[in-house]
Amino acid sequence: MKKRRSNLELLLQCFYRKKVYLSVFIVLALYCVNLLIENASSEKNVYDLLMQLTEFHPLTYTIIPTYLVVLTAHFSLGKMHHYLAFRCKDKRQWYNLNVSCIAIVTTGYSVLIAFIMLMQSLFVFRFENKWSTFAVDYYTYHATFLMNYSPLVYSIATLLLLWLLLFLLGLLFYVIFIWTKSPLVSLLFVFLLNIMNAAVTLGKIDTLTPVFFTDRVSIIQYVYKFDLNQDSFPYSIFVYWIMLIAVIYLIGWLVIQRVDFESEKGEKHHAS
């Protein structure tokens, strides 16, 4: 007898859109090649490249837009979401199922970018766990920080920050989707948020920078912007993102209370 698949397995299968993922992979691979060419230098190592994960240009112009493509493709499934809602016993299970799936996809997406960078760097950069000559000379303001923390620790923290940012945007995308029932509206909202962040950053509008994320996703930028003690690791940057995620999660929970879940399940059951 064939084992019945769990709701999470079904939802993850829905997330797997072969053509979309292949297109996203190609775009990411090409962009990472471009970063590799730009950063190729005997004075740099692989950690200089990994630091780019949370830099303004890669995030704004490639990483966030391609991530939004993946989310939009998934939430455009239509009837499959109705079927999955019918399989869930209540709103809480339905909501947490989607949140869990977004977390898993965000993890896979973040690891994929790091994996592409590492594979492309094998024959170009050194992998020793020490700061490059370029980093030491360029980040003179952060000399104390560089002495206290290794590039491996910094790279792991950078990957975690990338995950937190993308998961927050994914959660926001989902909350708007619950409210509007339109993946295109969700895409437009989050994409405009990204554009506004870019405008504030490029325009150097200091009064609005605290509202947006550029200064709080790169540890180097965060330490410089807020003139932090470089002898202590800036754990507050992670607390900031965790608190934001908690707020958006709670807002989503309030929004989903307005959904007539039992009625929708009945309609979906009838439609099937």
UniProtKB/Swiss-Prot annotation:
Signal peptide: none annotated. It is found in: Cell membrane. Keywords: Cell membrane, Membrane, Transmembrane, Transmembrane helix. GO terms for cellular component: plasma membrane. The chain crosses the membrane at residues 20-37, 57-77, 97-119, 155-177, 184-203, 234-256. The keyword Glycosyltransferase does not apply. It is a multi-pass membrane protein. It comes from the Bacteria. This is Uncharacterized protein BH0177.
